[in-house]
Curated annotation (Swiss-Prot):
Its main location: plastid. One of its GO terms (cellular component) is small ribosomal subunit. One of the primary rRNA binding proteins, it binds directly to 16S rRNA where it nucleates assembly of the body of the 30S subunit. One of its GO terms (molecular function) is structural constituent of ribosome. Residues 82-143 form the S4 RNA-binding domain. This is Small ribosomal subunit protein uS4c. CDD domains: S4. It comes from the Eukaryota. Belongs to the universal ribosomal protein uS4 family. It comes from Gladiolus papilio (Goldblotch gladiolus).
Amino acid sequence: RFKKIRRLGALPGLTSKRPRSGSDLKNQLRSGKRSQYRIRLEEKQKLRFHYGLTERQLLKYVHIAGKAKGSTGQILLQLLEMRLDNILFRLGMASTIPGARQLVNHRHILVNGRIVDIPSYRCKPRDIITTKNKQRSKALIQNFIASSPHQEELPNHLTIDPFQYKGLVNQIIDSKWIGLKINELLVVEYYSRQTDL
């Protein structure tokens, strides 16, 4: 993880650790020597590691975004941001996306009153996300919410009630609230050169 953030910059979904202040400057100095391919590859890797996706999963999302109306890059980011594991992370109900994925896999999370154990579940506006009514589930979420560093930065498409361990999806995310510094067009470009998008 440290190597990844040193090379790619802050990846809040993967870890709360941040690169040392000098490493950004080193990366910029090195970027003068980087090829266009390498720049596109690094943006793609940044996206993949932040959201914790396999190469195949990310490629699938790029294909879905490519078939939808609108900007492929913007739609790609919306698809990734509306995943259940990411929504839990953005709500502060988990400290990282891998941590959120574990909560979902272990059946601690309900969407609209039903257990959902698929981290890639695509959340929709008006979805209500709660924790199972069990002491262990509530204790896990309570710890995450209490120690969450990004509570005050909650994006405007989400609302949380920390006392009821309940999150609400208000709308599809607006691109300015994406939780990662990324040039999504370079990611789309990377894949369009690799495949027939």
